[in-house]
């Protein structure tokens, strides 16, 4: 729709990171669509469209994009994947004791559903004006490059590492069309992982920069609160 505000879709809108990203993008003029297991199909108090989504079922993802096109008459130019899953192996002394069903379910959330979302994003981007900034942003962590000896991160790390690869490959092959893909990873100033001390507003500010293609930030977008993009080697 000519003249309409761009649309940002946040898949996995939690109370800390997801809500901060939504707020930051809304302040940039985006129409916001949020999804979670508790989506209502109506508008939130903030004025965001809210849809229900089960990220353990990748086949359900296209219906979210269809609903957006039906309601807003356009496709999202920014898609943020902020959902994650981690199941602890029942035997802490055997990381491979996790049942296959649990492994598959978590892999769906961490890798397969975001892949399907990226497919849908690209299909939608092809219909948008050429000068519209188009970005797919995945909330990552250090597990794509660092193996921590903690059984709890088995499925989380597997999913992050797998997703980082296809995100990097997608960015390399679609960038010429103006389609950007980012693996966003908040770090401490010394490059160590922030762990559970993630900062919602810092994510919101940085994701808004990524959405607008500000600076020449690579697909592996490591960032520090108060500084923005910082490269760590």
Describe these PLM feature segments.
Residues 10-11, 81-82, 132-141, 180-185:
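Structural signature of the Rossmann-like NAD(P)-dependent dehydrogenase/reductase core
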Residues 85, 94-119, 126-172, 191-192:
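Catalytic loop of short-chain dehydrogenase/reductase
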Residues 80-92:
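Conserved NAD(P)H cofactor-binding loop of Rossmann-fold oxidoreductase domains
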Residues 28-43:
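Conserved glycine-rich Rossmann-like NAD(P)H-binding loop of the short-chain dehydrogenase/reductase
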Residues 56-75:
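Conserved Rossmann-fold cofactor-binding substructure of NAD(P)-dependent oxidoreductases
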Residues 45-60:
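Rossmann-fold cofactor-recognition segment
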Residues 168, 172, 176-233:
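C-terminal helical subdomain
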Residues 11-24:
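N-terminal Rossmann NAD(P)H-binding glycine-rich loop of SDR-like oxidoreductase domains
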């Amino acid at each position: 729709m000519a003249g309409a505000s761009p649309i940002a879709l946040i898949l996995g809108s939690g109370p800390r990171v997801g809500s901060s990203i939504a707020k930051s993008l809304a302040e940039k003029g985006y129409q916001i669509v949020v999804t979670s297991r508790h989506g209502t199909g109506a508008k939130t108090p903030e004025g965001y469209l809210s849809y229900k989504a089960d990220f353990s079922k990748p086949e359900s993802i296209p219906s979210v994009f269809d609903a957006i096109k039906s309601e807003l008459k356009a496709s999202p130019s920014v898609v943020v994947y902020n959902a994650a899953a981690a199941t602890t192996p029942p035997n802490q002394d055997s990381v491979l004791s996790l049942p296959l069903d649990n492994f598959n379910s978590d892999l769906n959330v961490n890798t397969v559903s975001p892949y399907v979302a990226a497919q849908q994003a690209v299909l939608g981007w092809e219909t948008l004006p050429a000068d519209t900034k188009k970005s797919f942003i995945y909330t990552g962590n250090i597990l794509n490059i660092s193996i921590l000896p903690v059984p709890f991160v088995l499925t989380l790390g597997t999913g992050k590492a797998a997703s980082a690869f296809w995100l990097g490959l997608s960015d390399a092959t679609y960038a010429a069309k103006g389609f950007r893909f980012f693996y966003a990873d908040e770090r401490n100033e010394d490059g160590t992982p922030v762990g559970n001390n993630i900062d919602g507003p810092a994510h919101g500010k940085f994701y808004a920069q990524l959405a607008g293609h500000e600076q020449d930030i690579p697909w592996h977008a490591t960032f520090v609160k108060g500084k923005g993009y910082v490269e760590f080697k």
